[in-house]
């Protein structure tokens, strides 16, 4: 008899309140299949890596990840071990005996899940035979020249083979397999074609054709129902990939997407409405001290300021304490990531700040990897000059301090001319002379290979943001991922984000958007759009996102020019906030991190697993979903105090007066508001299982 206990699952929106018997994981095996298991390529790696702990806590030794084998990743990320589960051990042994190379171990991340990794190159001799199998299964042919698709065919064929071996030795256990993206979809197609007794889930994080069409500057969302899908895929030479993706979607027992906006897209592009929307989460780590993340912001901001001192040597005519650090990061997709609208908004922001004679300087970083051949010599020289000046200042300070100390011991007020001798003055004059330069600070930190056609640099030339002294907006393109070993900006991405004031991600195509979510978890305000999954999620579940530091640009129902004006308004309003207002806003932003915790969002994956088991094994698992209650779902409430946002409590000048701060002291109590927010979010959610009590059922599972 299956054991179970009740689990209270409450909707963040869309999913009704429902109480079910917990799945008997002792009698189940869960496999998640993705090309990015131990293999960092894009955002799916983050999804799987961060979700692993929550899933491993729930499923224990019966949870396995399947991915490709790469020697470097295996050495650095995986600890090899022998499979404990008998069915998995037999499957691995059987495949190795038949000429495959299957590696098994624990992934060295939180949760330490088991991983099964297939060596693609070792099994490439089967490629032609497996192409025939795929053609017989779904009449999809793969061109010889498409190396990536051929690799996916090998990976999918090995996955289906492995799952067959597992089910042959499962000894009555039921198998659930979740496949992420089209790269893993061939394994699903072949498993279903061979009628393997497994419950399948297919999750799309973005549609193939959607990404291609949006990159071509097409008005995608207003023409979703007008595209000739086959024609568009054929013109872009991805028809076979599109067919694999669509076949995977229609073969799966349950189809899921990561956001509502992607669900709409998938319904039109792939011709199936998703059964469940599974938002992406993060592992949220709370600090023991309430304001520790504020201290980290100050510490890492100082390190960014050091870089700016070197990069802008000879042109440091602005106050670093009145400088705001903004950034955009991600793949180099100029239009999809919104770099085009961001640059245009920066041009307009520069005009506004100059027109109002603001003393605020905005420093904008573009962290987008592109093709480079080396560091920019001027940038390297700037950091060398900065370090030289620091050494000179430190040397003079030591001598100055010793002479001052001796004079005070003698009871004398020293003459500065006596303390600073001629050698010191000469050294300082040489140091000052070394900071002089005729050229402007470089816009990019590296030498770009195609700088004449680079979209970001071409736009910068058009709008004229060349880091002139008169510009209030300065731009720095860092065409490389951040690293703590870099000689220019030795910081990891997380450290850099914590040191910035605002992340700007005005994406046109963003199925979820981990970058603004990561900002939120770290207490950094961000700009997103209503075309990103994250933006739609926050718009749905937070009554006043702007008050909590989530600025949502309307890119769906406004023209590009209107969207650009709205973004400019957000940026200008942010520049007008006082330091205190920004601190209050960061506190509120960090409190939203509970909404993005996998402990909450993991329930959507639980629901998908229940659903697929009920469809694959209706005699064993059954679910009767009744109509959800008539409710609009939970909304994180607006702060009780006046929100320190451009729309609600911005100062009329770049800096607020002391009197204004005193007034804010009276109406804002950080601890009281934080406690109210904690109660608000915990009342509709439950982090732990609810062992007792029966509620009105909105879904019931029977054995």
UniProtKB/Swiss-Prot annotation:
UDP-alpha-D-glucose binds at residues 205, 211, 331, 510, 512-513. Its EC number is 2.4.1.11. GO terms for biological process: glycogen biosynthetic process; response to glucose. Residues 658-674 have a biased composition (Acidic residues). Residues 647-657 have a biased composition (Low complexity). Keywords: Allosteric enzyme, Disease variant, Glycogen biosynthesis, Glycogen storage disease, Glycosyltransferase, Phosphoprotein, Transferase. Changing residue 479 to Q: In GSD0; loss of glycogen (starch) synthase activity. Allosteric activation by glucose-6-phosphate. Phosphorylation reduces the activity towards UDP-glucose. When in the non-phosphorylated state, glycogen synthase does not require glucose-6-phosphate as an allosteric activator; when phosphorylated it does. UDP binds at residues 40, 331, 515. Optimum temperature is 30-40 degrees Celsius. Alpha-D-glucose 6-phosphate binds at residues 291-292, 294, 297, 301, 501, 582, 586. Signal peptide: none annotated. Transmembrane segments: none annotated. Changing residue 446 to D: In GSD0; loss of glycogen (starch) synthase activity. It is an enzyme of class 2 (transferase). Primed phosphorylation at Ser-657 (site 5) by CSNK2A1 and CSNK2A2 is required for inhibitory phosphorylation at Ser-641 (site 3a), Ser-645 (site 3b), Ser-649 (site 3c) and Ser-653 (site 4) by GSK3A an GSK3B. Dephosphorylation at Ser-641 and Ser-645 by PP1 activates the enzyme. Phosphorylation at Ser-8 is not required for interaction with GYG1. Interaction with GYG1 does not regulate the phosphorylation at Ser-8 and Ser-641. It is linked to Glycogen storage disease 0: A metabolic disorder characterized by fasting hypoglycemia presenting in infancy or early childhood, high blood ketones and low alanine and lactate concentrations. Although feeding relieves symptoms, it often results in postprandial hyperglycemia and hyperlactatemia. Belongs to the glycosyltransferase 3 family. Part of the glycogen synthase (GS)-glycogenin complex, a heterooctamer composed of a tetramer of GS and 2 dimers of glycogenin, where each GS protomer binds to one glycogenin subunit (via glycogenin C-terminus); the GS tetramer may dissociate from glycogenin dimers to continue glycogen polymerization on its own. May also form a heterooctamer complex with GYG1 (via GYG1 C-terminus). This is Glycogen [starch] synthase, liver. The gene is GYS2.
